[in-house]
């Protein structure tokens, strides 16, 4: 405890720092997936899909099961970190050139796959299949069948 108090004045500051670290790690993981040669609409969304739908532990930390984060959002500073992050993603994905409807469906589907992977409900094969389908949807593709 004394080591933590040396770096953080209280529990809330520690939690805010942890949240900021997780938010930053996800954003960095997505940005590492941006294809600089891809100038088509949906470039950021494709990076988002590739980052979320690979099973990377760094990314899955962001989507850890709810009990891990229980009680974290009990104070304004933590809520502010999450709201800022959510607003950043909403703004940047909206400006990515895809229709708002496509952004909504593809983004939430990618997040759902990531969450399912956290619970061990997706195999690498099913993640790869979902990833390919979602990538296709960013390029105007339709659902099969």
Residue ranges and their predicted role:
Residues 59-61, 76-83, 87-145:
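Hydrophobic/aromatic-rich alpha-helical bundle segments in the mid-to-C-terminal region
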Residues 26-34, 71-82:
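An acidic intrinsically disordered interaction segment
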Residues 48-52, 65-70, 106-113:
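Short alpha-helical scaffolding segments that buttress acidic/His motifs in well-ordered protein cores
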Residues 31, 49, 69-70, 90-94:
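Amphipathic alpha-helical segments within well-ordered protein domains
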Residues 17, 25-65:
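Hydrophobic alpha-helical connector segments
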């Amino acid at each position: 405890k004394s080591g933590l108090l040396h770096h953080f004045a209280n529990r809330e500051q520690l939690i805010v720092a942890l949240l900021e670290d997780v938010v930053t790690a996800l954003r960095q993981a997505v940005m590492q997936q941006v294809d600089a040669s891809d100038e088509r609409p949906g470039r950021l969304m494709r990076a988002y899909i590739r980052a979320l739908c690979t099973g990377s532990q760094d990314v899955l930390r962001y989507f850890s099961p709810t009990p891990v984060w229980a009680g974290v959002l009990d104070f304004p500073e933590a809520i502010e970190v999450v709201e800022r992050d959510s607003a950043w993603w909403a703004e940047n994905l909206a400006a990515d050139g895809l229709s708002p409807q496509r952004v909504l469906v593809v983004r939430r589907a990618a997040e759902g796959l990531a969450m399912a992977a956290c619970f061990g409900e997706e195999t690498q094969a099913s993640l790869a299949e979902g990833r390919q389908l979602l990538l296709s949807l960013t390029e105007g593709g339709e659902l099969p069948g």
